[in-house]
Amino acid sequence: MSNPTMILSTTLLAISCAISGCGSDSNSVTAPTVESDGDLSSHVVATKVFTNGEVYTVNPEQPWAQAVALKGNKIIFVGNNQGVKAYLGKSTHIIDLKGKMMMPGFHDVHMHPLESASAATQFTIPAYASEGEYIDAIYTASVQNPDAQWLIGYGHEITSLLEMERAPLSVINEAVADRPVIIMEQTSHSMWVNGKALQLSGINVNSQDPIGGVYGRDVSGKLDGILYDNAGNQVMELAMKSLPNAQQQDHSGLIEYTMPELNKAGITSISDARTYWQRGHLETWQQVEKDDKLTLRVSLGLWAYPGMNDERQISTLKSLYQNDPQSLLKVNQVKFYMDGILVNTTAAMHEPYDTNWLDLYQNKGLNYFTQSRLEKYIKALEATGFDFNIHGIGDRGIHEALNAIERASKGNARHRITHLEVVNSEDYTRFEKLNVIADAQVAGEFTDPNHWPDTIPLIGSERAQGLVPIKNLLSAGATLTLSSDWNVSTFNPFVGLSNAISRVPQNITLAQAIEAYTINSAYAMRQEQVVGSIEVGKLADLVVLDRNLFEQNASEIKNTKVEMTLLDGEVVYQR
């Protein structure tokens, strides 16, 4: 799409060059002839200047520009090619964008970077396979990892287990019986375990379900090998303790894989949405910072353990708070789960599920944290400075989270509710009223309207309409952020942008989607004053793209490539 401001700026520049004789290339910017930078002592001399670009600033006062000048890590000029000449000196590095698009670096305020790239996972199994294929895959993993105390895997979908002819416990026991095995399902909301894992965890047929979790059982009441939600999390905690050098492997994974890949996608700021501080995750991030290896701005969301004593947990969380404004790493968020997920029939709903995987009477899902407990944490931790990232998928879970914030918050926090799959229409306006950020993920295919019918057997046709209602929430005044929940969905922001504008009837404009990935997410991370848009005085977290997103259709946006990513004015990725 042509931009009138850009056309006008280019035209004026061409006229200016014609008058001043600045060369045949009307868009060229040449440093003035001076003996040294000292000759420009009355001016600020830029260290980097970007010219001839289509710069989308996400600043409503100046949406588009041609040129950007940096002094160290700060933006000192945003405007046209002619205006930026005043900031040039002999040492200025001039980068000709050649018409490419520049925009603020992307934020992803909900992802799981440590878990997604962790070396803790020793093997992967298919999402769907026959019982025999699963047995072969798990047995092969045991042969390939002879010294592992626990076999830790990943990859199946829950329905692949629920549709087995035999109990999943019988199948996995046939593969490996002498060592504990735990396999995380793709959403991380259930685990498939063998008998040895149950034994070492102290789980038997008489065990009571833990807070926020369910031990899967067959029709006779026997354990079936599926641990739903927090029931699985507790066993995974035990499995992780068996790993030697886990922190060092996670440290290497962040530096060598995760951060480079995120920078390659144009991402400059993230929130770790589940920092397991009892697994060493916090220390891993802190070591990366200490080693001066961070290439992202990072806010950690400390995991709130649902089974832990509240007073002990609150005291510990307060002690871990870290919010140095000069640091790239901040520990200023807490991650709470209100409920589970729809496909497990554990998302908290007002009305019972039509299909009940858990065989619980009048199953309406479960709570990791009740409304009253969440209120307690809000009252205790807001004063410290924590913002809450609250997992809410079912209409009851979301409603209770809003209730807790309304009853307990002092109003200065920036709490957000994430996922937002089934939202009651009467709760739409409460997001703006309570200053609650609406965080959604649309990069995954399962949130696409074409897949809404998949949930009809679980919650009926009426509740299955309008899942993840980003358009309705925006229309009701909510501050919307878009994120990935990687590795549940791809972290590629261009997939998210493409889906956001094409998921009719809950689609939004490209400008709104970009705001959700930039300035709105910066607001959620309490850094909108320094990043999230391209403005004078802000820090230079920037990304250069191979195309103007506003001139592409939805499918073309998905194919966008990042040419360059800058954090704090320094190039952290270049194609």
PLM region descriptions:
Residues 1-9:
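Bacterial N-terminal signal peptides that target proteins for export
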Residues 18-21:
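C-terminal motif of bacterial Sec signal peptides marking the signal peptidase cleavage site
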Residues 23-26:
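Bacterial signal peptide processing site
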Residues 38-51, 60-316, 332, 336-397, ...:
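Divalent metal-binding segments
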Residues 253, 378-415, 420, 425, ...:
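His/Asp/Glu-enriched, well-ordered alpha-helical/loop segment
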Residues 288-292, 318-329, 410, 431-433:
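Acidic (Asp/Glu)-rich catalytic clusters
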